Regions:
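Single conserved hydrophobic/aromatic residue that forms the stacking wall/gate
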Residues: 1-11, 129
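Short, conserved glycine- and acidic-residue-centered signature motifs
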Residues: 3, 80-84, 194
Length: 219
């Protein structure tokens, strides 16, 4: 019950956070959220719904605890919504672009964090995989992706799931999405973090040999 569990909410900017009361009402009622929005993905591990509120489109991403084993495995970890929030701040601090969070919400249970929400504003632009299939400018994409990986190396950071569907292109800017697996590289991950991102990105552009060859040399 809502009265029996603590909640944590973080709003990035009160002037830009949008209609918080409406957002919270949808977070509290999953059925209402699905009814008023358009379900993008509904899986055991997460739910994504697009909702239009006061002429602004928002994406609600709910990170679900699948079962008791999954819950126990995440008992001493930060929620994926919180991790996305922290990653956004790391990336923007070094001049990179990422999906802007409007709000994160963390549900706390007796044994720690449970479900969590990340609410982001809709991005103007085109998903990178769609842009590639529509014959986008490879030079712009090459420059943007190479710059993204270069700055990740500056701060020993990793995206965690660097495939084309997790990036948008808006003008000349590359915008990162889905940062719940992103993070600062510690001693154990430093040797394979960015390289794993590189392998994932190159695999996702295997059908575009010209772009693949350019990025292989630059990232």
């Amino acid at each position: 019950m809502w009265t029996r569990r603590q909640r944590q909410m973080c709003i990035r900017d009160s002037k830009k956070s949008g209609p918080v009361k409406k957002i919270m009402s949808l977070i509290k009622d999953e059925d209402l959220l699905i009814k008023e929005g358009r379900s993008i993905k509904d899986e055991e591990g997460h739910l994504i719904v697009k909702v239009k509120i006061e002429e602004q489109n928002y994406f609600f991403k709910k990170y679900r605890i699948k079962n008791a084993i999954h819950g126990f495995s995440r008992l001493f970890k930060k929620t994926r919504a919180y991790n996305s929030w922290i990653a956004f701040n790391w990336l923007t601090a070094v001049g990179l672009h990422a999906a802007e969070p409007a709000l994160i919400f963390i549900e706390n249970g007796f044994l720690g964090n449970r479900h969590s929400f990340l609410v982001t504003k809709e991005i103007k632009g085109q998903r990178l995989d769609d842009a590639l299939s529509n014959s986008a400018n490879f030079d712009t994409i090459t420059s943007g992706i190479a710059g993204f990986f270069k700055r990740l190396r500056w701060i020993n950071f990793q995206h965690g799931d660097a495939k084309t569907s997790n990036f948008f292109i808006s003008g000349k800017n590359i915008i990162a999405l889905d940062l719940d697996a992103a993070g600062y590289e510690n001693f154990f991950s430093r040797f394979n973090g960015v390289s794993r991102d590189k392998k994932r990105l190159l695999k996702s552009i295997a059908n575009y040999p010209k772009l693949h060859n350019k990025l292989f040399k630059r990232i």
